[in-house]
From Swiss-Prot:
UniProt GO MF annotations: ATP binding; metal ion binding; NAD binding; NAD+ kinase activity
Matches recorded under InterPro entries: ATP-NAD_kinase_N (IPR017438), ATP-NAD_kinase_PpnK-typ_C (IPR017437), NAD/diacylglycerol_kinase_sf (IPR016064), NADK (IPR002504)
Cofactor(s) needed for function: a divalent metal cation
Name under which the protein is recorded: NAD kinase
Family: Belongs to the NAD kinase family.
Keywords: ATP-binding, Cytoplasm, Kinase, NAD, NADP, Nucleotide-binding, Transferase
Lineage: Bacteria, Bacillati, Bacillota, Clostridia, Eubacteriales
Keyword Transferase part of the UniProt annotation: yes
Record's catalysed reaction(s): NAD(+) + ATP = ADP + NADP(+) + H(+)
Length: 276
């Protein structure tokens, strides 16, 4: 691999100790022509990133989500996620496994898996499409009253319910907020979407799973409630009356490196169920 980029969550490595270690190890194992350290809030020319053969992301799940949201529309470089954070459910390896991970990449003992992304636009608002690796949440503000929501699938009304909100989740996001709200766990390589009501006050409001090629439209009936759309828990936009949230499968994918010894169920048991 000739060109390698590194993105690090500086809040978790203020003295650059981890960054310097990773640069040293990358040179030792992969001997690249160039190593480019990229700020996670990068505002430069994205053309500079298109030549990367590998992007190493140092942080936790939040850092990976931010990278997916920010860079997925401009580069399709395989990503090696190294956990230096807390949960690290989405990452490829822990920092203690760095040597093994780089060696496996050196000898080609890895695979690149594609993860589904969601695309989100707000009807009635001039804004760019947003991308989400985990979920799009349409929900009331913290101090707001309960709101009512209409959910359409391919422009046909699916349900109307009162509650705190609704989560539109990818398979990757099924282990996040959706899981806490009673949504199903979904194998990450599937191309499906779950629709999960949050604290519904309407009888028989249950999660729904649909094919990823379907389009979802959420119409909050806003009266006295403040309602927001939140992308991967990182970016929030307040909705006004008559705004509708349009959600569909993005044309891009999040491409992450994985190893055969890290099975999905093994990670579930260890990090979600706390079973070794």
């Amino acid at each position: 691999m000739r060109n390698i980029g590194i993105i690090i969550n500086k809040e978790k490595d203020k003295e650059n100790e981890i960054l310097n270690l990773v640069i040293l190890k990358v040179k030792e194992y992969l001997n690249p022509d160039e190593i480019k350290v990229i700020d996670q809030f990068y505002k430069g020319d994205y053309k500079d990133l298109m030549a990367l053969d590998l992007l190493i992301v140092l942080g936790g799940d939040g850092t990976l989500l931010g990278v997916a949201r920010k860079f997925s529309t401009v580069i399709d470089t395989p990503i090696l996620g190294i956990n230096i954070g807390n949960l690290g459910f989405l990452v490829t390896a822990e920092i203690s496994e760095l040597d093994e991970a780089l060696y496996r990449i050196k000898v080609g003992d890895y695979k690149v898996e594609e993860r589904m992304l969601l695309s989100c636009t707000i009807e009635g608002v001039t804004c760019s499409e947003e991308r989400a690796l985990n979920d799009i949440v349409v929900a009331r503000g913290t101090l707001s009253r309960m709101a009512q929501y209409e959910v359409f699938i391919n422009d046909e009304l699916y349900a109307t319910f009162k509650g705190d909100g609704v989560i539109i989740s990818t398979p990757v996001g099924s282990t996040a907020y959706s899981f806490s709200a009673g949504g199903p766990l979904i194998m990450p390589d599937l191309q499906i979407v779950s629709i999960v009501p949050i604290c519904p006050h309407t009888p028989n409001s249950r999660p729904m799973i649909i094919d990823g090629n379907n389009k979802v439209r959420v119409k909050p009936l806003i009266n006295e409630s403040d309602v927001f759309v939140t992308i991967d828990g990182q970016k929030a936009l307040k909705l006004e009356k008559h705004n509708e949230v349009l959600i569909k499968k993005a044309k891009e994918f999040f491409r992450i490196i994985s190893f055969d010894n890290k099975s999905y169920f093994k990670v579930l048991r260890k990090k979600l169920f706390k079973i070794e």
